[in-house]
Structures are given as structure tokens and as C-alpha cells.
């Protein structure tokens, strides 16, 4: 499916740095590029350094060195020109008002991103 960048409601892009997913870049660069891999009806988000965005059993967002089954697979839900990233246990990747990346069981503007095709 190619590379994507995801811009949060706060104007910052999801960014993969070291073992963390953050949002402190107001512009996109290689840290904010995610390769979308098809896995049947779901997708995986692979970072520039080959790690996978994942959601753990305690609903934390982390980067994994390997594809961790359902923990690393997502549905991209498109609506009204935006996208939501729905993952493990039906939780959405979310960005709070301070830019902290976590998950939310609720689908609201914190869990909605502008999708930029690169």
C-alpha cells in the first residue's frame, strides 16, 4: 500500500523514535513515515527502521522488532477525509491534548488523523 504519514489533531505527526511512538514533529520526515503492509483484511504499520507499531495487552502503544500477530495488526477506518487506526481489543491509537500517544476505546477527534500518502 505504500508509505503514509499521520497528522494528529494537534498538528504534529505520529513519529517512531527508538522504541516509542510520539508526536512532536510539526513536519514529516523519515521518523514519521510508516510503510503500510497488507495482511488480509488488516494492515501492519512498519517504521523507517523496520519495527512495527503495536498495541500491548495493557493497551500501550509500542514498537516491536517483529510482527506480533494481532498486537501489530490494524484496521484503517476512513471517514470524512480522515483516518482512524483501530487495533488490538478494538482500541484506537489516540493523541491527547499534550501530544502523548496512547489508546482509546472511544472514537473521537483524538483518534482521528489526516493521512498523507507519500
Curated annotation (Swiss-Prot):
Post-translational modification here is noted as: Phosphorylated.
**Whereabouts are the sequence repeats?**
34-46, 74-86
Q: Where is this region: Disordered?
A: 99-118
An example of a Gene Ontology cellular component annotation for this protein is: cytosol
Cytoplasm as a keyword of this entry, yes or no, is yes
Q: Where is the lipid attached (N-myristoyl glycine)?
A: 2
What does the record say about its membrane topology? Lipid-anchor
Where's it found, cell-wise? Cytoplasm; Cell membrane
Provide the residue span(s) of the region labelled 2 X 13 AA approximate repeats. Answer: 34-86
Extract the ranges annotated as region (Contains several HHXH repeats): 8-109
Alphabetical UniProt keywords: Actin-binding, Cell membrane, Cytoplasm, Disulfide bond, Lipoprotein, Membrane, Myristate, Phosphoprotein, Repeat
Predominant location: cytoplasm
**Pfam families per the UniProt record, alphabetical:** Fascin
Question: Molecular function (GO) terms listed?
Answer: actin filament binding; fatty acid binding; lipid binding; protein-macromolecule adaptor activity
Q: Which GO terms describe its biological process?
A: actin filament polymerization; hyperosmotic response; response to acidic pH
Name the protein family: Belongs to the hisactophilin family.
Q: Tell me how this protein assembles.
A: Homodimer or heterodimer of hatA and hatB, linked by a disulfide bond.
Q: Specify the protein name.
A: Hisactophilin-2
What organism is listed for this UniProt entry? Dictyostelium discoideum
Q: What is the lineage of its organism?
A: Eukaryota, Amoebozoa, Evosea, Eumycetozoa, Dictyostelia
As recorded in Swiss-Prot or TrEMBL, the protein's gene is named hatB
